[in-house]
Amino acid sequence: METNPRKLRSYSYICLIVCIFVLVVCAILSRAEEKEGKGENDDHIPKIYSILVEGEPLAFRASTNINSKAMALEAKKIEEIHDEILGSTLEKGSYTKLYSFKHVINAIAVRTTASQAKKLGKTKGVKAVEEDKGVKLMTTYTPDFLELPQQVWQKISNEGDRRAGEDIVIGFVDTGINPTHPSFAALDLTNPYSSNLSRLHFSGDCEIGPFFPPGSCNGKIISARFFSAGARASGALNSSLDILSPFDASGHGSHVASIAAGNAGVPVIVDGFFYGRASGMAPRSRIAVYKAIYPSIGTLVDVIAAIDQAIMDGVDVLTLSVGPDEPPVDKPTVLGIFDLAMLLARKAGVFVVQAVGNNGPSPSSVLSYSPWVVGVAAGNTDRSYPAPLILDGGQTVQGVGLSGPTLGAPLVQHRLVLAKDAVRTNGSVLQPLTRDIEECQRPENFDPAAVFGSIVICTFSDGFYNQMSTVLAITQTARTLGFMGFILIANPRFGDYVAEPVIFSAPGILIPTVSAAQIILRYYEEKTFRDTRGVATQFGARARIGEGRNSVFAGKAPVVSRFSSRGPAFIDATRSPLDVLKPDILAPGHQIWGAWSLPSAFDPILTGRSFAILSGTSMATPHIAGIGALIKQLNPSWTPAMIASAISTTANEYDSNGEIISAEYYELSRLFPSNHFDHGAGHVNPARALDPGLVLPAGFEDYISFLCSLPNISPATIRDATGVLCTTTLSHPANLNHPSVTISALKESLVVRRSFQDVSNKTETYLGSVLPPNGTTVRLTPTWFTVPPQKTQDLDIEFNVTQVLNKFTFGEVVLTGSLNHIIRIPLSVKTI
C-alpha cells in the first residue's frame, strides 16, 4: 500500500477539488431549477400592461369639437371595442381594466398575468402589448441668471412679470400641487386672472378631495385631476401617504410647477431666514395639474392617462419631469407607449418637454429618445452656498450646508468630538465600534456628557451608499443629545462623496472631499489626548461653524451637472445609437429653489417647510417649459417644432468665461470640456429664443417619415404603433428637418438637407460657416442666401469621411445673419 505522505496529500487535494466541483455544480443546478420554478410561478403574479389598439383616437378625427355629443358617442364606441377585446380574449376574472385611453392614443391599460397578456398580443385589433415598467421622478436666482426680467419679460409686455405667460396653460404630469402655496395664489386684486377659460381654448376640471377643497382651483390653478387606477392595481398604495386627490404629498410637483409658472416675487423664507424672492419663468401662465405619481408608487399607465387627459383639456405646454424607469426591451425606444403618447401630443399642437434623467455621467444614459420631444439636461449656475468650518487657529475648511452659525459666532469656539471617541461605555468596557456610531445614526450610542454642547464629527460611510443611513438621523441625534453642531466628513476608505445643500435645523456642514476631511482629522488628533488603549481622555480641538445660508456668485457657469444623463440616444436594448441628438438643450437644474409641500413624503428632512432647494433634470425641465410658454405667448401661431427650434438654434455653447461649456464627470474636483451629448445644442438663451430669425418647421408626417426611415424597423411595425402607413420615407433618418444633425454611422459621404423658415419681418442675408467634426469635411450649399420674411430656404450639408474614427466627434454649422441673428446647428457624427 502506498504511504508516501506527499502523494497522500496530492490525492486528498484532488478529492477536495472534486468535492468542491460537485458542490458547485449541484448549487448551480439547484439555483437554475429554483429560477425556472420562479419563472413558471411568475405567470400567477398579475402585472400592468398597456394594450395599443387599432383605430384613430378621438383628437385626430374629423370633428373639431371634442366635447360634442357625436364625439361622446364615438368615445363610447371606442370603449365598447376595448371591452369586447378584453372580454372575448381573456378568461373571466383573469383581468382588471384600469383605463380606456381614447383621446390622443387608442389603448387599454389592464392588470393581468403574462400568459393572458400574450393572448392579447395575438388578438385581432391589437397592435402592441407593453408591460408597465413603472416611472420615476426625474428659484430665486435663475430668472436673473437667464436675464428674464431685463431681456425677456419686457419684450413680451412693458408690464414685465405682470403679463409674462398671460393666457398660456402649462400642464404638469407629476405628484400634484400644494394649492395653498403663495407661488400659486391668485390674490393680486389689481391684476386678476380672467375666469373665461374658453378664450384659452382650455376645458379642465377641478377634482376635490383630501387636502384639496373647493376653491383650490383659483384662477392661477385652473384645473387639477389625479390618476390612480394603475397605482391602486399595483397593490403598493399606502393609505397614510398616498393621498387620493390632486394634493401634492411629496413636494416634487409643487417644486416643478413653481419653477415654470410660479408667481413673481414670492419671498423664500425657511426657518426664519430670507433667501430671496422666487419667480417662475412664465409667472402669469396658468397651471393645469395631472397627478400621476404617489409617494409609494408610480405606474406608466397612470402617466399615460394623465397625458391623454392633458391633451384633451387643451394645454399649450406639457411638462414631464417624470419618465419610465427603463427603456422598453422588446421594441424600439421611439415606439414605446410613453414616446408614442408624446408624439400624439405633438400632433395635437402641444409643446412637450421631458427630463432626460439623472443617470449621468454615464454615456447613453438618457431616458429621452424621440425628436418630437425636447429632452432637457441640467446645468449648474454660478450660485453656491459655501459653509465654513473655522478651526481654532484660523484655518477655514469649506463645506456644504444651509444652516446658521454655531452659538456665539464669530467669537466663541466649541469643542470638537469625533463620534467614535464619544461612545457610551459599560463601566470600563468599550462598546464595539459599528457603522451607525461613526455615522451618528442613533443617540443611544453616545455618552451624553461627551457630545453635549460639542461639534460632533460624523463619518460618511457605506450606510449612506446603501441608503440605510440618513442625514435626517444625524440631525435627530444632534437634537436629542444637544450637539452644538455636526460635521459629516468624507471617509478615506470610500473617497469623496457628492454633497448638495441641505436645510439643517441645527448648525451642520457636509465635508464631501477626503482632502478637507483629512485637514480636520489631522488637527483633531493633534489636539486630542489618548490613553494607552487609544481612548480619548481630553478633547482639546476647538472650532465653530460659520453662516452657511448666504449665497456666493462666482466661478464659471453654466456647467453640466454630474447627475445629468448623457447621450447618445439609442434605439434598442443593445443601445445602438439613434440619429437624434439627446439631450436637446441645457437649462439650470442644480440647487434650484422652489415651492414645497409640508408633508414632504419623499424627503422627511424637509417636512414642515414651504420651500426646498433641489437638483435634478426635473428642475431643469420646467425652465424650458416656462420659456416655451413665453415664446408661445409672443408667437401664438408657432408650432411646437418651431418653438423647439428657436430654443435650440439660439442656445449658448460658451460659459461666462467665454470658454466651451464644461461638464462634471466622476471626479469631484475636475471639470472637462463638454460636447453635444452632454449639453445638447447648448445652454438656453431665452432672449435670443424669442427672436431666432430662422426656425426649422416639422410636423407629424415628418416624424412618421423619420420613423419609416429607421433601419431594422418594418413598415408594419410603424403602422401598428402609429396607425399610419409608411407612404414616404427619408433617404436617411438624419434628413428629418431637425435643429441638429446626428449621424450614427457615416460611410464615405452623405448629404442632408435642412429647410429654414424666416420668422422675422425683414429680409435678411445669411452667411454659412462650418466647424466640421473630426474625421470629416463638411460643405454647405449654398454658402450664403437671402430670405424674405415668412419664406423658406433649403440648405444642403454634405459630409465626407476623411478618417474612420469609430467614435462620435462634434462640430457645428453657423448661419450669421445681416440683422444679427445667429443660428447654430450642432453636428454629431460617427465615421465608420
UniProtKB/Swiss-Prot annotation:
Enzyme class name: hydrolase
InterPro entries with a match to the protein in the record: Peptidase_S8/S53_dom (IPR000209), Peptidase_S8/S53_dom_sf (IPR036852), Peptidase_S8_Asp-AS (IPR023827), Peptidase_S8_His-AS (IPR022398), Peptidase_S8_Ser-AS (IPR023828), Peptidase_S8_subtilisin-rel (IPR015500), Peptidases_S8_3 (IPR034197), S8pro/Inhibitor_I9 (IPR010259)
Alphabetically ordered keywords of this record: Developmental protein, Glycoprotein, Hydrolase, Protease, Secreted, Serine protease, Signal
The protein's name: Subtilisin-like protease SBT2.4
EC number, UniProt record: 3.4.21.-
Domain spans labelled PA: 425-524
Top-level taxonomy: Eukaryota, Viridiplantae, Streptophyta, Embryophyta, Tracheophyta
Subcellular location: Secreted
Span of domain Peptidase S8: 150-690
Domain Inhibitor I9, chain residue ranges per copy: 74-138
Annotated family: Belongs to the peptidase S8 family.
Listed GO MF terms: serine-type endopeptidase activity
Active-site residues annotated for this sequence: 174 (charge relay system), 252 (charge relay system), 618 (charge relay system)
Phenotype upon gene inactivation: Seedlings lethality when homozygous due to water loss. Mutant seedling grown under high humidity can survive and show small, crinkled cotyledons and fused leaves due to impaired cuticule formation.
PROSITE patterns reported in the protein's UniProt record: SUBTILASE, SUBTILASE_ASP, SUBTILASE_HIS, SUBTILASE_SER
Pfam families: fn3_6, Inhibitor_I9, Peptidase_S8
GO biological process, one term: proteolysis
Principal localisation: secreted
Gene: SBT2.4
SUPFAM superfamilies for the chain: Subtilisin-like
Glycosylated residues (UniProt): 196, 238, 426, 761, 774, 800
